[in-house]
Swiss-Prot record:
Protein name, entry field: ATP-dependent 6-phosphofructokinase subunit alpha
Known EC number: 2.7.1.11
Protein's organism: Komagataella phaffii (strain GS115 / ATCC 20864) (Yeast)
Active site: 361 (proton acceptor)
Cofactors required: Mg(2+)
Annotated pathway: Carbohydrate degradation; glycolysis; D-glyceraldehyde 3-phosphate and glycerone phosphate from D-glucose: step 3/4
Subunit annotation: Heterododecamer of 4 alpha, 4 beta and 4 gamma chains. The gamma chain bridges the N-terminal halves of the alpha and beta subunits.
A GO CC term assigned to this protein in UniProt: 6-phosphofructokinase complex
């Protein structure tokens, strides 16, 4: 009996130098059921992409025939094949012959070479493949016109030739010593349960009762839309709904058919880091017509959908609300025409609409931010930072045009974040007659002070007070008139591109989850909501009112009522505009306070460095100098003051370019005033400080408390003092946000994206990423949410063996559902102090051991890289906002003392007096100077900016041992993260 040439083929390579033959061979094998898993075209690819590629290949396609393997049922009720290394009996001695639970997989590499090839036609290459469906394969080959060649080998059924002339043989025997296999069901283990007709009927009935939700992305694309799609899909599935993607915006709703597709849990894996929207977006003309909305209604009812989550701008949301209002008439019309049944009419007679604002313009009223706005702002400041380098080198001026249509939010915030000299926005247009002169004065004044570059931001909707457009060309001409070498840069659609920033991932995720909850809680009497954010709080606003108020802004601008337009923007818009003027325009001397009210303000950095220390110092300095105050930098923390008396007065030119500088220009460390309180008091008296701003983390908070507690012994500390939290750990009591934490999260999101890419390339690798944060789990919780981590370990939620077992079960289930085809990497996030026992290395080791060859684990520790380099847009904007509020706090407290006619000069200096022998604060009039509320921590809590006395925080709201506040304000992030990773489903089960 002749022996087969190959009995256990797993990989082979076919080569040709004929391009047409290459394509024909590719088509031949795909018709036989092979799938393309990798393609290569000769170009300048990096080395890691060339692994396995032949050096003389012009083009390669790798084809794979996935093995028949053990079938298991997933938690979602789907049946998937297990990979070889997960099958029963893998690595056992029995597998040396063949696995009874998995056939061999095959990889074919097709190569197009640039070399001359000489093939022996008399002795062509020959390979043998196994198939469990020999008759179907024979029929398929006959169908495509392939030659059937009888075999002389007993174990080989027949042969054929591929277009390259290679002989391909087929056998029903997996190996020489095995028995003949005639059905793929042989490999289905355990055996598939035969379902009764009754069970099928019950399933149909149960599915009919499920809420069906469609998700649409409409209008201009925005970074973060994919995160919203992911959140809506997984939250919907978690809450027992069926979720459909409506492709190409409202166009898909009108066309129906394949444009409405149900989404499964794994369909949205890996979307967090992808910009734009994978389900497409379009501005639909058809949906604007009633017939289009009627057809959309029919398509929704036909699919059983009566809830719509719309992610788009004001136009998209307006269309959605109109659709809801017309729905009763539309569905009644469909019933009358006989297109739907009475049962369908009764079931879907009401439409639920929930809006998510996805727009880079941030032009929707009733919310602080829209999905995509801060990613766009991040792109702008990144590009302007690059421009700054060449502008300073050549002493040039740059006019930068940004998007925003009729909203100046991008223009205003980019002006603040980039340290621009001047901005043009539609809400606050300059005088038609004076703007050119005003622009010249500001730019020349800054040049005279020593600035080498000039930056002017122009919003695309910029106008003057007579509604005449102001173009970038006009601005350039004005700057040229004063002798500046000027260039125009239009950033254009690059502002929409790229991966979403950390905040937009967070915003889209939590709003997407709340949108599903809003759908389930909705009744016909509840107006359609739009999910918004005010400070750090997710709220629901009436969609109609938000859209109407947004349109009112445009109407106010058209009516030249610019004050009204400014007020109609979000609550901080007008304040931010004033903040910009205070650091860019008011240095002209027009805002100087009387000499008797001028102060000496000290600024000190305490604790670990973060990226936002310098921007906050810059704004506090420029704002104070504009009013005539003197600003002193205490260098190298309290250690520098105590040891060297390191105090330096800051001038305008010293700080003007600190807006994009990370670290600390004046130096920082963890030293505290308690090291030598007397010396600290001495230097405070020497420089006659009237106020102190301490910028830093928990050490800054501790330093403020120590200074406050020392007031009884050192009256100089009775000055108003403010702690501005700036730490990546976000562990300062009294605030839910700290400067520098957003930069850290952006850095972590990029780091984890890279790690996940590495994990996805190897398919079977999981990374355990260790993040900083001390005993505060904020950073880990937030990072887990925005990176799609399977599990997050924090100090607030103790780790035990059961927790780890559940997470390994989730990991195993995820790999099962991927079936080796999904490229999304898996990561765990582990806080550095989460557990003394279950460390990062131990968690990784446990995962690796539990994998037993099915998957492996690695650790990744970004360390101090997390602090970031250049501050993020959010940190720059908030540094400006909070630093100015700190300055105002110091000014107000001093005003009450210095202008109190009932106090003597000494009492004003001491800031207290004795009333019938009782020591009384000159600020508050309270009987104890310690309780006069002039030692405070500024913070964001809920939807408010607060000033909280440090003593109150220290005594009531601080966990001293763990160096953090008692309020775990980020706990909701863990719940949402667990819900979307599948972790919550396992624990619920």
């Amino acid at each position: 009996m002749p022996e087969p040439s190959i009995s256990a083929l797993s990989f082979t390579s076919f080569v040709t130098n004929d391009d047409k033959l290459f394509e024909e061979t590719f088509n031949f094998y795909t018709k036989l059921g092979f799938h393309a898993t990798r393609s290569y075209v000769k170009d300048n690819r990096s080395d890691f992409e060339l692994t396995g590629i032949s050096t003389d290949s012009i083009k390669e396609i790798w084809l794979e025939s996935f093995p028949l393997s053990e079938v298991v049922e997933t938690s979602a009720g789907r049946e998937l094949r297990k990979p070889l290394q997960e099958s029963v009996g893998y690595q056992s001695e029995a597998l040396l012959g063949y696995s009874p639970y998995q056939s061999d997989g095959v990889v074919i590499k097709l190569r197009l070479s640039n070399h001359d090839l000489q093939k022996n036609k008399d002795l062509p290459g020959e390979v043998t493949f196994f198939t469990a469906s020999i008759d179907k394969l024979r029929a398929k080959l006959i169908e495509i016109g392939a030659e059937i060649i009888p075999s002389e080998i007993d174990l080989v059924e027949f042969s054929t030739k591929d277009p390259m002339g290679d002989v391909i043989s087929f056998s029903s025997y997996p190996s020489l010593s095995s028995k003949k296999i005639t059905s793929p069901d042989f490999f289905l283990h355990p055996k598939k349960e035969v379902r009764s007709q009754e069970s099928i009927v019950e399933q149909v009935k149960s599915e009919e009762g499920k809420k069906k939700i469609a998700i649409i992305t409409s209008g201009g694309d925005a970074p973060g839309m994919n995160a919203a799609v992911r959140a809506v899909t997984r939250a919907g599935i978690f809450y027992g709904c069926k979720v459909y993607a409506c492709y190409e915006g409202y166009t898909g709703l009108v066309k129906g058919g394949d444009m409405l597709k149900e989404l499964q849990w794994q369909d949205v894996r890996g979307l967090l880091s992808i910009g734009g929207t994978i389900i497409g977006t379009a501005r639909s003309k058809e949906f604007r017509e009633r017939w289009g909305r009627l057809q959309a209604c029919y398509n929704m009812v036909s699919n059983g959908i009566d809830a719509l989550v719309v992610c788009g701008g004001d136009g998209s949301l307006t269309g959605a609300d109109l659709f809801r209002n017309e729905w009763p008439e539309l569905i009644k019309e469909l019933l009358g025409e006989g297109k739907i049944t009475k049962e369908q009419y009764e079931t879907h007679r009401n439409l639920t609409i929930v809006g998510l604002v996805g727009s880079i313009d941030n032009d929707m009223c009733g919310t602080d931010s829209t999905i995509g706005a801060y990613s766009s702002l991040e792109r702008i400041i990144e590009l302007v930072d690059y421009i700054d380098a060449t502008a300073a080198s050549h002493s040039r001026a740059f006019v930068v045009e940004v998007m925003g249509r009729h909203c100046g939010w991008l223009g205003l915030m980019s002006g603040i974040a980039t340290g621009a000299d001047y901005i043009f926005i539609p809400e606050r247009p300059p005088s038609e007659t004076n703007w050119k002169d005003d622009l010249k004065k500001v730019c020349l004044r800054h040049r005279e002070k020593g600035r080498r570059k000039t930056t002017v931001i122009v919003a695309e909707g910029a106008i003057d007070d007579q509604l005449n457009p102001i173009t970038s060309e006009e601005v350039k001409d004005v700057l040229v008139e004063i002798g500046l070498d000027t260039r125009i840069t239009r950033l254009g659609h690059v502002q929409r591109g790229g991966a979403p920033c950390a905040f937009d991932r967070f915003l889209a995720t939590v709003q997407g989850v709340d949108a599903v909850r809003a759908v389930l809680e909705s009744t016909p009497a509840i107006p359609s909501p739009v999910i918004s954010i005010l400070e750090n709080k997710i709220v629901r606003q009436p969609l109609v009112e938000s859209v109407a108020q947004t349109k009112t802004v445009s109407d106010a601008i058209e009516a030249k009522d610019f004050d009204k337009a400014l007020k109609l923007r979000d609550q901080e818009f007008a304040t931010s505009y004033e903040s910009f003027l205070s650091v860019s325009k008011y240095d002209d001397g027009s805002y100087l306070v009387p000499e008797s009210s001028r102060l000496n303000i000290a600024i000190i950095h305490v604790g670990a460095p973060t990226s936002a220390l310098n921007p906050a110092t810059r704004v506090a300095t420029l704002n104070s100098l504009a009013k005539g105050h003197r600003v002193f930098a205490i260098r190298n923390g309290f250690a520098g003051l105590i040891r060297h008396g390191a105090v330096r007065e800051l001038n305008w030119i010293d700080v003007e370019d600190w807006h994009n500088t990370g670290g600390s220009e004046i130096g920082t460390n963890r030293s505290l005033p308690s090291d030598d309180m007397g010396t600290v008091a001495y230097y405070f008296q020497q420089y006659k400080f009237d106020g102190l701003i301490i910028i830093g983390g928990f050490e800054a908070f501790t330093a403020l408390y120590q200074l406050d507690a020392a007031r009884a012994q050192y009256p100089i500390f009775n000055i108003p003092m403010c702690c501005l939290p700036a730490t990546v750990s976000n562990n300062v009591p009294g605030t839910e946000y700290s400067l520098g934490s957003d930069t850290c999260l952006n850095t972590l999101s990029g780091y984890c994206d890279a790690v996940k890419q590495s994990a996805s390339a190897s398919r079977r690798r999981t990374f355990v990423v260790e993040v900083q944060g001390g005993y505060s789990g904020y950073l880990a919780s937030y990072a887990g949410l925005i990176t799609g981590a399977l599990a997050v370990y924090t100090p607030e939620n103790p780790i035990n063996l059961q927790t780890v077992q559940e997470d390994i079960e989730l990991l195993t289930r995820t790999y099962e559902e991927d079936d080796g085809k999904n490229r999304s990497g898996k990561i765990f996030i582990h806080n550095e102090k989460a557990s003394k026992v279950y460390t990062t290395d131990l968690i990784a080791a446990i995962i690796g051991e539990a994998g037993k060859g099915r998957f492996e684990s690695r650790t990744a520790v970004p360390g101090h890289v997390q602090q970031g380099k250049s501050p993020s847009s959010i940190d720059r904007v908030n540094a400006c906002r909070l630093a100015i509020k700190c300055c105002n706090f110091i000014e107000d407290a001093n005003f009450q003392v210095k202008h109190n006619a009932n106090l003597s000069a000494d009492e004003r200096h001491l800031r207290f007096f004795y009333d019938d022998g009782v020591k009384t604060s000159a600020v508050s009039g309270k009987s104890s100077v310690i309780d006069d509320n002039t030692s405070v921590v500024i913070g964001i809590q809920g939807s408010e900016v607060t000033f909280t006395p440090v003593k109150q925080l220290w005594e009531k709201e601080t966990h001293h041992k763990w160096r953090k506040g008692k309020n775990v304000h980020w706990e909701q992030l863990n719940i949402v993260s667990d819900l979307l990773s599948g972790r919550l489903s396992i624990r619920t089960t």
